[in-house]
A protein has these predicted regions:
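Zinc-dependent deaminase catalytic domain
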Residues: 1-137
Length: 137
């Protein structure tokens, strides 16, 4: 049976998350246009070529200050002219990422896991009329 574009995007995001160096929480994102073509992928991590010591990852609160979210990394690679339509994430986006997602004109967000239920993220998606759906894949 042929899988849907949403399922494909989630599976791509699940593979992409393995690029993250974060040993505690790996997140992957895949952005599609209306035709189901992949526009961008992203994962949570530091800026490219950032040199860090191995003990950087041990202090959760310290590392969280510097990590760039997967959604931000994926959206940084596209423009509104690309007409992003669907964002699939392995984790429910936080409120800050929700605003960023909405500002890019994305209409549908799919995710597979809730790390922390972020009520504000739900409210933001609802306010901007972006559909949000948890997929069980």
């Amino acid at each position: 049976m042929r899988i849907s574009f949403e399922e494909m995007a989630i599976k791509v995001a699940d593979v992409v998350k393995d690029r993250s160096e974060d040993p505690y929480k790996k997140v992957g994102v895949c952005v599609l246009n209306k035709e189901g073509r992949i526009l961008s992928v992203g994962y949570n991590g530091l800026l490219s070529k950032q040199q860090i010591s191995n003990d950087f990852w041990e202090d959760r609160d310290e590392r969280r200050k510097y990590i760039i979210h997967a959604e931000t990394n994926a959206l940084a690679c596209i423009t509104r002219y690309d007409e992003p339509y669907i964002l699939a994430s392995t984790l429910l986006p936080c409120a800050n990422c929700a605003i960023n997602i909405c500002s890019h004109g994305i209409k549908h967000v799919y995710y597979t896991e809730e790390y922390h239920k972020d009520q504000l993220a739900y409210e933001i998606f609802d306010f901007y009329k972006v559909s949000l759906k948890k997929l069980n894949i």
